From Swiss-Prot:
Taxonomic lineage from the root: Bacteria, Bacillati, Cyanobacteriota, Cyanophyceae, Synechococcales
GO molecular function per UniProt: acetylglutamate kinase activity; ATP binding
Gene: argB
Record's GO cellular component terms: cytoplasm
EC number(s) on file: 2.7.2.8
Family: Belongs to the acetylglutamate kinase family. ArgB subfamily.
Functional note: Catalyzes the ATP-dependent phosphorylation of N-acetyl-L-glutamate.
Enzyme class: transferase
Protein's UniProt name: Acetylglutamate kinase
Record organism: Synechococcus sp. (strain JA-3-3Ab) (Cyanobacteria bacterium Yellowstone A-Prime)
Length: 300
């Protein structure tokens, strides 16, 4: 439903201090998985990212594409399976992963950003020696890697030139062997290396829930210590564990805040960043938790 002009003006005024606070700051956004399935919602998310860039914020987008990979593996009659939530990646699967993420999904995102009036450059970890990968050392999962090192210079250059870097989570080791790396992990490590203001994980859940069956049990703010306790007590479980661990690691390396929210909810990114209430879960370093909780008007 359309709102009246006065309400629109009030919305803009509410967003103003957040825009001023984050202007010129880097925000790393991870987008992928089920949250990318619906084409209209995907285009909307990318328009929101273009909006952030237009008001002076410096977004960096890291993407996955699991459903798209599954679809192409099925088309090519290549069987696939997962172990402990990780895609078993043999040589044939790795070839498809790189083809889909780097050659298809990445370029689709760049094109949608262009159609929304933004300017983006598509990359993978191989480009400009951006990401050096290494094996996880588990033979049963094949070419599933982890981040060995990041050279953020190329991304910094693109940001300074007003571009939106769009990065797929494929990288190679020192021999040139390609690896499939978890996109959450890449986003977290990249956020740390860039000294980002925020790490945003767009998922298919509202955030961290005390009860996974009850969306109203959303935890809106927690610090590193509390997040670790929630993992230990089983409140955070399943696929949410690596996401929370990724946020904890990024915060420990200097990222000021991390957010987990539903990428499929309309304009969730803008609502989380530019409104007082937010819509997801915000994680903060422990040393800031007491101070921030006392600030009723603190920035998201």
């Amino acid at each position: 439903m359309a709102c009246d002009p006065l309400t629109r003006a009030q919305i803009l005024i509410e967003a103003l201090p957040y825009i001023q606070q984050y202007q010129g700051r880097v925000i790393v956004i991870k987008y992928g998985g089920a949250a990318m399935v619906h084409q209209e919602r995907r285009a909307e998310v990318l328009r929101d990212i273009v909006f952030l860039a237009c008001v002076g914020i410096r977004p960096v987008l890291v993407h996955g594409g699991g459903p798209e990979i599954n679809s192409w593996l099925q088309k090519l009659d290549i069987p696939f399976k997962f172990v402990d939530g990780l895609r078993v990646t043999d040589a044939a699967t790795m070839e498809v992963v790189e083809m889909v993420l780097v050659g298809k999904v990445n370029k689709q995102i760049v094109q949608l950003i262009s159609l929304a009036g933004g300017s983006a450059v598509g990359l993978c970890g191989r480009d400009g020696n951006l990401i050096r990968a290494r094996s996880q050392g588990r033979a049963e999962i094949g070419f599933v890697g982890e981040v060995s090192s990041i050279n953020p210079q190329l991304v910094q250059t693109l940001l300074e030139g007003g571009q939106i870097p769009v990065i797929s989570s494929v990288a190679a080791d020192e021999t040139g062997q390609a690896y499939n790396i978890n996109a959450d992990t890449v986003a977290g490590e990249l956020a740390a290396s860039l000294g980002a203001e925020k790490l945003i994980l767009l998922t298919d859940t509202p955030g961290i829930l005390r009860d996974p069956e009850d969306p109203s049990s959303l935890i809106t703010l927690l610090d590193i210590e509390t997040a670790r306790q929630l993992i230990q007590t089983g409140v955070v479980r399943g696929g949410m564990i690596p996401k929370v661990q990724c946020c904890i690691r990024a915060l420990a390396q200097g990222v000021r805040a991390a957010h987990i929210l539903d990428g499929g909810s309309p304009h969730s990114l803008l609502l989380e960043l530019l409104t007082d209430a937010g819509v997801g879960t915000k994680l903060i370093p422990s040393q800031f938790s007491a101070q921030l909780r006392e600030q009723s008007n603190g920035f998201r």
